[in-house]
Amino acid sequence: MVYSYSEKKRIRKDFGKRPKVLDIPYLLSIQLDSFKKFTDHDPTGERGLEAAFRSVFPIKSFSGYSELQYVSYKLGEPVFDVKECQIRGVTYSAPLRVKLRMVLFDREAAAGTVKDIKEQEVYMGDIPMMTNNGTFVINGTERVIVSQLHRSPGVFFDHDRGKTHSSGKVLYNARIIPYRGSWLDFEFDPKDALFVRIDRRRKLPATIILRALEYSTQDILDLFFERIEFKIKKDSLVMALVPDRLRGETAGYDIKDAEGALLVEAGRRITARHIKQLEKTNTTELEVPVDYIVGKYAAQDYIDEDTGEVLVTANSEITLEDLAKLSLAGIKNIDTLFINDLDHGAYIADTLRIDSTTNRLEALVEIYRMMRPGEPPTKDAAEGLFQNLFFSEERYDLSKVGRMKFNRRLEIAEDEGNGVLSKEDIVSVMKKIIEIRNGYDEVDDIDHLGNRRIRSVGEMAENQFRVGLVRVERAVRERLSLGDLNELMPQDLINAKPISAAVKEFFGSSQLSQFMDQNNPLSEVTHKRRISALGPGGLTRERAGFEVRDVHPTHYGRLCPIETPEGPNIGLINSLASFARTNSYGFLETPYRKVVDGVITDDVEYLSAIEEGRYVIAQANIEVDADGRMAEEQIACRHKGESTFMRAADVQYMDVSPQQIISVAASLIPFLEHDDANRALMGANMQRQAVPTLRADKPLVGTGIERTLAVDSGVVVAAKRGGVVDYVDASRIVVKVNEDELHAGEAGIDIYNLTKYTRSNQNTCINQRPCCSVGEPVVRGDVLADGPSTDLGDLALGQNMRIAFMPWNGYNFEDSILISERVAQEDRFTTIHIQELSCIARDTKLGSEEITADIPNVGESALSKLDESGIVYIGAEVKGGDILVGKVTPKGETQLTPEEKLLRAIFGEKASDVKDSSLRVPNSVKGTIIDVQVFTRDGVEKDKRALEIEDMHVRQARKDLGEEFKILEEGVLGRARNLLLSVGYSEAKLAEIPRKDVLIQVIDDETKQTELEQLAEQHEELKADFDKTFEIKRRKITQGDDLAPGVLKIVKVYLAVKRTIQPGDKMAGRHGNKGVISKICPVEDMPYDEEGNPVDIVLNPLGVPSRMNIGQVLEVHMGAAAKGIGNKITAMLEEQREIAELRGYIKQVYELGDDVLQRVDIDSFTDDEVVRLATNLKGGIPIATPAFDGAKEKEIKQMLALAGLPESGQLTLCDGRTGNEFERKVTVGYMYMLKLNHLVDDKMHARSTGSYSLVTQQPLGGKAQFGGQRFGEMEVWALEAYGAAYTLQEMLTVKSDDVNGRTQMYKNIVDGNHQMQPGMPESFNVLLKEIRSLGINIELDQE
């Protein structure tokens, strides 16, 4: 493999054995592609904004003499960029402008004659725009729209699994689900009649809907039944024989063939053998006794032609009297319905008998009564309602997907079709459910991913936008029908508010619009790749059963079987598998390699769950010989959702990668294949909670996906184009672009501005640091700067810690963790948290609040950190209770005491009519002020501090832009100099020409002169651009802010808190091995090895066997080897060994392992590159062991040997306190540990006195309310068990809700009288009141 200059800095040794056929696709594409489809113009008008407009427009007036037509739309540019929106707390959105055409028709002239056309561009609200990283900024906070997994539109057949009826009979049902519109259900009842429900209302006999579709009884019978023909003879009947229909019946008479030979005697069951004999003898008719027809149903009406009397009605049971009547009337032939109990049930015939309606109108009225109970039905209303339910394009849409699923399920050839239902569709569904009831077909599996589809951002936003448009449509139609349209323009007809409101509601408060989890880069990526079955139109937690939550065979390669939350949402929220994507219908598909005649090709095809069932698919880890053929005869495969063994020749596809089945979070776990699934789930979930540490440390044992994840998450800065690093400082990187990657006539400079110390959604710190130096060559995609939790472009969520598995004085009992003081001293797990505190000055009824340093009754010391405007200085160290922003609020008029009146008379009015409402630092918080932002309403005078901040921002903007301009200008001038040198100018001559005059030289070569003029023009453009950009920036900074009504000023203070690791913090490994720190132990007391090196962390060995996450032990061994190799390299560098020796050792390391694919050609590295690589490997050689394709035990032993460590991975340790050796050898090595965002500082608090609940007068609970610890029922039992009566009394009275008792208690304590007089607890009075409210009087007797 060829490595770029920056990739050579540190190469991860990969133990993967399988060739990479496909790189992991861009991880955020599910979000970005979906939203792009929404905003891009779609010429076909099938999706996005275009589809929404086309579905609602043109809007015609009720009279038909005017209409509003849609022409086109365009999205403008957002006013503020993403960062500005976050600072100002506004939404990052673009204005939507739509070109509309109003057409007026001439009332007098022929229909369709146009009288007037007006076209105008109309503003239709703002559409929130997606940032480059797949998020939305809504009101200043980053949010993610989670994709939803919902039931695909189409038709589904199911049964109740025998749960509805007490007999346990299985009742079948069918459901037609449209994309929008009413649901149509068909279901059997226990008596086998078929019923229909519309929108889950009251059920009606299914034949009612057929009658409403203009089918008569006769039509219905002909649709669903075959006929048996009988000829009436004198004493018997002759039946037309179809031998197959007799199967399973008991012969009630002798059956003879045409020659009179006996085939079946009376009383015998007719079997398949008898039927074959009948077919052989070509018997077409059979003479049967007269009573054979009794009990069968007539297939049509039989009428006496002479009198017109109906002798036998269709679907009525035939009796002997009926036969006699028919004979008398001279009717020779009679047809009956073919019905048997085995596989041709009488379901529709039975249903017709229950059906009280006889014609279309009665059926429509019945449906109307069911849908609109209590309303008097009229013919028009009934017809209109039924028409609108399933046959109107405005009210009903199956969608493209729905039609495709519908047609495929009912075996209709084409996939395309109408969005509304047809008569034939409804009949086909009824026929299919009867087929299923008759045993000819199977029910569907609703948890199959072929029946569930993904709705992503774009589609949901489009639906909301359409909802808004439909609201507008009603208003427009009314306006078109009302006033004089000659005066009006399209702008006057459209009110954009409902559209904005619908879109805003969706992005702001929909269940699927979530506050982005921004703990670390992994949590961002997983949040964007999350697939939820909850939300509008989805499931609810309470209703979802076990089957929906379970892992389904079709999840393979589509949804991760491991990563899902624990708790009530388990299985309802899933994560997209690494290689999965959605197809044009919204179904998930996964890639497979094509296998042709047992040879594996490199052709990759994506298959959806529906298509996959038809093929035989081998796993990725099958043995393959040198020619790419499968080495074994029998191959482990998947076919039709089952795992089985098949011949190599039958295999059609093969997995592309062993990591295909799991999500990115799960594929970050090394040795995942050795962990129990439950623990792997916890491991995957806990990595998302890791807090970025002060200095990121790459994992020694990784899986090789770390770089992909870090780059795709967008937290690192990756090079857009190749070139050479020209300038680097903490906040900017400048790259001079390679000549071959330039566009014509550009400066050839890329400038990357870095994010510094910004707050994330979870209050963690986002900071980017350059990881390249001037003069380094870079190629496209190289990492130039690390973000939070990344180290040289690798995701780094935690720290590599030296751990030992052994008990230590009970300090690691029950998963507790013992850590060394050195870990805290070296700031290994120190994290920075940034809190945003806001102070809002409002206009109140009594006057406006004021931000000032002049605060009543506050000492000088409390104001020491504030400036004259009353706002804290940047850089001030503050602690709990300190004032950050001084604010006073007007007080209501109160009755003044004579003393106060006197004071007022002497010192003037202002003395006491304001109260202090300053912003203070919350208790238990201590930190440094790193930034202050002041927002002032337009028209309100800015204070001194606001003007200072504004001035600073303007200066900073000028400096930044000036430097950018200088860099770009230098690029242009440099190219101009090179041009002049190429036409014969000497260096000396160039040195004499003033800098700017280089561009106005005149040269003979015409083409070169043109080039020079182009550069000069470009220089002018750059200057104009600079001035324009600066002016825009300056205007944005100095303009007033658009604040909420009644708000005059907002001050935001950013406070950075440094949190070191301490007892009570939660830590975890990557294998679900979590624990709480129990003690920070002095370094000298920690166990140490024979060389005197103490361990950092001691873990309990009992945490491994029962949890079955053995991956952590292998990780520790591999980590020990990796670190050992790093130590060896360090020793070689310190001893200044020959480079050849160093090169040889590094080469040996990279070549270790059986069949390992990775080839690192160390020989091609220069000496400098080898030394730089070795320097970066001093801390240990990073290792990749991909999931399901990782390092084997043998390879771990080889690594340990290479590091000069015992192959067992165990060392003799000594006790740090006594110096004695421990009895047994101990497993010691390096494990990657994470500090999770469950910090003891955020959880622990203690209450002295605080607020009480209003009704019960008991102390509140929880840290936010400064609450107490609940002394609950069980705690009371404990005190009762000890017989501690007085303690118990104290707990239930003066320490809780005995109001008088607790105030008296203070006095007693102050007086030194340590006694208590318990009284009546307030909650007892509440109980009395509740009993009285039930109408039972209860009085307390005073003794």
UniProtKB/Swiss-Prot annotation:
It comes from Shewanella frigidimarina (strain NCIMB 400). One of its GO terms (cellular component) is DNA-directed RNA polymerase complex. DNA-dependent RNA polymerase catalyzes the transcription of DNA into RNA using the four ribonucleoside triphosphates as substrates. One of its GO terms (molecular function) is DNA-directed RNA polymerase activity. It comes from the Bacteria. Keywords: DNA-directed RNA polymerase, Nucleotidyltransferase, Transcription, Transferase. Belongs to the RNA polymerase beta chain family. Its EC number is 2.7.7.6. The RNAP catalytic core consists of 2 alpha, 1 beta, 1 beta' and 1 omega subunit. When a sigma factor is associated with the core the holoenzyme is formed, which can initiate transcription. NCBIfam families: PRK00405.1, rpoB. It catalyses: RNA(n) + a ribonucleoside 5'-triphosphate = RNA(n+1) + diphosphate. One of its GO terms (biological process) is DNA-templated transcription. This is DNA-directed RNA polymerase subunit beta. CDD domains: RNA_pol_B_RPB2. Pfam families: RNA_pol_Rpb2_1 (PF04563), RNA_pol_Rpb2_2 (PF04561), RNA_pol_Rpb2_3 (PF04565), RNA_pol_Rpb2_45 (PF10385), RNA_pol_Rpb2_6 (PF00562), RNA_pol_Rpb2_7 (PF04560). The keyword Repeat does not apply. The keyword Transcription applies.
